[in-house]
């Protein structure tokens, strides 16, 4: 409780004339962590994609465009304008859910030379940091009133042994969705952080 009260005090100072606050530092750490994860996601995806034949790339991309990511079930802003209109707490809550949805699937991410075994722990660290920011911005609001939405079904065929073609498709889907979701979280946290500085231009 003392930690939450302290963080609430810190975040309230974010609108004052002080150039840097502890609240902003917490946001900076979270943004830095998700930027790193987004870079890892991009590297994993592009290294995997470059290992495919041109026709395989074309077919998988076509299938992915017709498919959807599990995390699409998490209600989030549909465009940059809605993102900019969303409250800090809403952006943090969506980010938390997106990060949490990848803690288990990230363990099976493959491709390239990126440190795959470190992804899940880094997601857990990021989730913990976002939770601190949520607690600091709650102001008495219930954390996740629609908690049932947090329970997402596993990715299709996630627990099954697959043939070569289906395994290729699942890997492509996981990497593409992971990259997409880390980009979302990076955007949401960056906008939320910007809101702490009233003079800042938070245009996407």
Curated annotation (Swiss-Prot):
Entries under PROSITE patterns matching the protein: SOMATOTROPIN_1 (PS00266), SOMATOTROPIN_2 (PS00338)
Disulphide bridges: 69-177, 194-202
Claim: Ubl conjugation is one of the keywords in the record: no
Keywords per UniProt: Disulfide bond, Hormone, Metal-binding, Pyrrolidone carboxylic acid, Secreted, Signal, Zinc
Ranges that cross the membrane: none
Molecular function terms, GO-annotated: growth hormone activity; growth hormone receptor binding; metal ion binding
Main location: secreted
Cell membrane as UniProt keyword: no
BP-aspect Gene Ontology terms: animal organ development; growth hormone receptor signaling pathway; positive regulation of growth; positive regulation of receptor signaling pathway via JAK-STAT; response to nutrient levels
Positions with a binding annotation for Zn(2+): 36, 186
GO CC, alphabetical: extracellular space
Family annotation (Pfam families): Hormone_1
Entry-linked SUPFAM superfamilies: 4-helical cytokines
Source organism superkingdom: Eukaryota
Record localization: Secreted
CDD domains xrefs: somatotropin_like (cd10285)
Residues recorded as bearing Pyrrolidone carboxylic acid in the entry: 18
Role description: Growth hormone plays an important role in growth control and is involved in the regulation of several anabolic processes. Implicated as an osmoregulatory substance important for seawater adaptation.
Family as reported in the entry's similarity comment: Belongs to the somatotropin/prolactin family.
PANTHER family for this protein: SOMATOTROPIN (PTHR11417:SF2), SOMATOTROPIN,PROLACTIN (PTHR11417)
Name assigned to this protein: Somatotropin
Gene: gh
